[in-house]
Amino acid sequence: MVEAGTRDPLESALLDSRYLVQAKIASGGTSTVYRGLDVRLDRPVALKVMDARYAGDEQFLTRFRLEARAVARLNNRALVAVYDQGKDGRHPFLVMELIEGGTLRELLIERGPMPPHAVVAVLRPVLGGLAAAHRAGLVHRDVKPENILISDDGDVKLADFGLVRAVAAASITSTGVILGTAAYLSPEQVRDGNADPRSDVYSVGVLVYELLTGHTPFTGDSALSIAYQRLDADVPRASAVIDGVPPQFDELVACATARNPADRYADAIAMGADLEAIAEELALPEFRVPAPRNSAQHRSAALYRSRITQQGQLGAKPVHHPTRQLTRQPGDCSEPASGSEPEHEPITGQFAGIAIEEFIWARQHARRMVLVWVSVVLAITGLVASAAWTIGSNLSGLL
């Protein structure tokens, strides 16, 4: 896949007046995935935008809508949720759950082959998601590490259901072209393009081999030569490549990748049951699958955040404060005074050139003068009242 780097013409576009395209995550042969925002619900989303050549292909658009609706009806935490689909101008698009993390391919590149307990931790949700789809009559057709996402919280989810079928229905797709990823195709997909749940089982079997050994079972000079090898050769035993692989995993891969579909597990449900029996027999510990550290999704998120920061810095205006700003330094908040020091310091200094002490004396002097005058007034009032009472009481004698 081609990673996001420079600016893309669709970035900052608003698809269908609702979905803001923020930054490219990765692109492939038929589509580009962006991180985006549903502005109506204020929800982060992943936007898979199909190549513009499909915009006028009614056969593709019809199948694209049907597959999107079918997957949206599935309710399984191991499947990347589909929220919406649409077409904005020259771009059919799919709106999906945004997984903050990376792909299983990126994890394999970072860490290499996995021990059996880690393989089981990956396969459980993958087979669980496929089982839900198989019960609903859906087939993935393109199970591979690139379509298995790992969140930063350790959730493993399967993505891109039905996309191969939609591309196959397009009138621009040449007859006889093998669709899917050559390394993971089942013999029947290579032979005649047919697929059913057992085809997904074959792809998972190849995936198990790759997780245990670090590479796919068939190699060649071209995708076509790799695809055709599985018509005449069985997938080899992983234990022949990596020491310590339990024979139960060899048997799991052999049963999943039998060249005759009738000899395989019937669907993901049957394969999942066998996987659980193996995990119990070997007493494999529980394991949380880590997300890749340097994923395209993480880089896309960092790029978008840096752009937002730059825009904020360029657009920021200085704030004017007409009043004085006081900045408290770390040392300003001192510990309470010890008992040997006075609790209150004497007030010193000046105000308008006059010593503070003079203000204090003046205020105290003014208070004393007020009290003196109040006492004088009260005394005079008392004398007058007393005289009036005396005169009033002797008035009859005088008369």
Swiss-Prot record:
Alphabetical list of InterPro entries matching this protein? Kinase-like_dom_sf (IPR011009), Prot_kinase_dom (IPR000719), Ser/Thr_kinase_AS (IPR008271)
Q: Does the keyword ATP-binding apply?
A: yes
State which Enzyme Commission number(s) the record gives.
2.7.11.1
**What Pfam families does the database record attribute to this sequence?**
Pkinase
Keyword ATP-binding listed: yes
List residues traversing the bilayer. Answer: 369-389
> Which Gene3D superfamilies has this protein been placed in?
Phosphorylase Kinase, domain 1, Transferase(Phosphotransferase) domain 1
Catalytically driven reaction(s): L-seryl-[protein] + ATP = O-phospho-L-seryl-[protein] + ADP + H(+); L-threonyl-[protein] + ATP = O-phospho-L-threonyl-[protein] + ADP + H(+)
Q: What is its main location?
A: membrane
Q: Name one GO molecular function term.
A: ATP binding
Q: Which segments sit on the Extracellular face?
A: 390-399
- Provide the membrane-side ranges marked Cytoplasmic in the record: 1-368
Please tell me where ATP binds in this chain: 25-33, 48
Alphabetically ordered keywords of this record: ATP-binding, Cell membrane, Kinase, Membrane, Nucleotide-binding, Phosphoprotein, Serine/threonine-protein kinase, Transferase, Transmembrane, Transmembrane helix
Catalytic center residues: 142 (proton acceptor)
User: In what residue span(s) does the Protein kinase domain sit?
Assistant: 19-278
**Topology relative to the membrane:** Single-pass membrane protein
Q: Mind naming one GO cellular-component term on file for this protein? A: plasma membrane
Family stated for the protein in its record: Belongs to the protein kinase superfamily. Ser/Thr protein kinase family.
This one is known as Serine/threonine-protein kinase PknL
Q: What is the lineage of its organism?
A: Bacteria, Bacillati, Actinomycetota, Actinomycetes, Mycobacteriales
